[in-house]
Amino acid sequence: MVSSEVRDLLAQVPNWSQADRPAAFRTIITTITSSPDPSHFAADLKAVTDAIFLESLGVVATRALVIDLIDALKSLASGGPSADSINSTTSSIWLDVGKAIQQHIQSNPTLATSLVDQTATIYEELLAAAHESQNSFTDAAKTLAAIPLDSSQRRVTDKYKADLWIRIIRNYLEDDDATSAETYLNKLKNIIHNVADDNPVLNLHFKLSAARIQDSNRQFLAASQSYYEISLSPAIAEEERLHTLSMAIKCAVLAPAGPPRSRVLARLYKDERSASLEEFGILEKMFLDRLLARAEVEKFAQGLAPHQLATTSDGSTVLAKAMVEHNLLAVSRLYRNIGFDALGSWLGLDSGNKAEEITARMIEQGRLAGSIDQIDRIIYFESGLEASGEKGSGRAEVPVGKEMRRQDGMVQALAEDLERITDDLLVEFPQLVPAGVPGN
């Protein structure tokens, strides 16, 4: 409800001349912000806003009064127009009055064209900040996205665009909307090279946003590499570097098993800082291709984000799939061949057929070297052949009978070694040769 004092002041405005009315409105705005009772702020400022736009004051006078209204609203924040310094009462006033001002501006084409800078300020410093303080991050992002850029009346720098888009991206990511965030990240990629060198903090935010989007999109290998690069940056505190290193390890663990992941794991494992992190135990086992127990996996899962525990199209979680594939690689280091059912038991799967399906997919994708005998239900791991990570590179080019031929070769080599030893003994001790044996 409008206070009686403001109502009386507004009633006197028609008595003022057209030239003196801007000053009259400015006096009313000052009266409102000076009042010790904030309960009428929103209603009083909205009443003044309505009265200002009902008058035909002209663009110049209206612009000046809009600036006064914006300053009056910003003065309500204890530490400036940032989400951290805005209480719930202030954010509500900013939203109510800010939207009212903006609606009046947009309803008048002349003002909408002429007050572009003021529109941007309302969106950026009032409405978006208020939404952020109320944890309405998607609303904040949409508000920021409405700010006009590069109109004929307003030119902005690449630095301004980059700061704005980073803020939009971070708001969308707060609500786990990676799809919308990626739209603005792609825009940012086109200009980041123009501002990155002179703005290391902005460049860091760009890299972190890219890593978070890759993480949310389950591009875990790329996310791990991005997080690790950030963890080496001297621009952030040691605690933050360790946190991003931890995120790099988590993403590497969740990445599809295979040569590319092995290279990333090696890099993380050899980083001396990793040993101080809680995730080092599982990192070490994965790097050394050791089998992971269910209890270890469950403990690791407690530190993952919700999207990292999401269910995939086949009903399993990303973590469960990653662990099965890792343990399959570990089994390939222990056995040269194994039956479908036995492998399924090792991997904790319901059936051997599921084990065959996973193995076949990894071989086809070049993440595991081996071959499958579907008739005898046996999987042969090729210990001397490393998959490259390229599709099809894991398929062995030799027939399944390789192991039998390998055994034959070993027996033949043993026989040849035995014969050579016998010949050497006979040369050294000819008396051991029985009488009548040829050559004696």
Curated annotation (Swiss-Prot):
Record's protein name: COP9 signalosome complex subunit 4
SUPFAM superfamilies in alphabetical order: Winged helix' DNA-binding domain (SSF46785)
Cellular component annotations (GO), alphabetically ordered: COP9 signalosome; cytoplasm
Record Gene3D superfamilies: Winged helix-like DNA-binding domain superfamily/Winged helix DNA-binding domain
Family from the record: Belongs to the CSN4 family.
InterPro entries, A to Z: PCI_dom, PSMD12-CSN4-like_N, PSMD12/CSN4, WH-like_DNA-bd_sf, WH_DNA-bd_sf
Subcellular localization, as worded in the UniProt entry: Cytoplasm; Nucleus
Domain annotation PCI: ranges: 216-386
Gene: csn-4
Protein's job: Component of the COP9 signalosome (CSN) complex that acts as an regulator of the ubiquitin (Ubl) conjugation pathway by mediating the deneddylation of the cullin subunit of SCF-type E3 ubiquitin-protein ligase complexes. The CSN complex is involved in the regulation of the circadian clock through its control of the stability of the SCF(FWD1) complex.
Top-level taxon of origin: Eukaryota
Assigned keywords, A-Z: Cytoplasm, Nucleus, Signalosome
One Pfam entry name: PCI
Subunit organization: Component of the COP9 signalosome (CSN) complex.
Species, as recorded: Neurospora crassa (strain ATCC 24698 / 74-OR23-1A / CBS 708.71 / DSM 1257 / FGSC 987)
